[in-house]
């Protein structure tokens, strides 16, 4: 990904979308959302997702790209957002990354490579089966053997 991008970051409902749109209009840019909840379709409440009017005022990317049941990760975000940014730059426009998910933003702008990152659910599946067979109390007692502080919080 080319390094020419603008980033607008901050908490939910702090005016990032409005500023991003103004920058896109003034600088010939397109918005790339960096919000871990706005990627999901039908997750509009509580996410301050850009409205139809705001989307009409500037091109938006990385909104409504996944179903809520879909597995999503920072690695996948970086892969798809990088592709968006590269495409925007190839068309002579400026990517404007707008959002509040710091991990997404940091990973995108630092160019982290997740190519060798694979998900292995073996341990998760094993522990889930253990929980199902032993029950919550026994599983908590086992956790206390390895991490008493964490077990005490549960």
Q: Language-model segments: which ranges?
A:
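Phosphate/pyrophosphate-binding catalytic cores of soluble transferases and nucleic-acid-acting enzymes
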Residues: 1-154
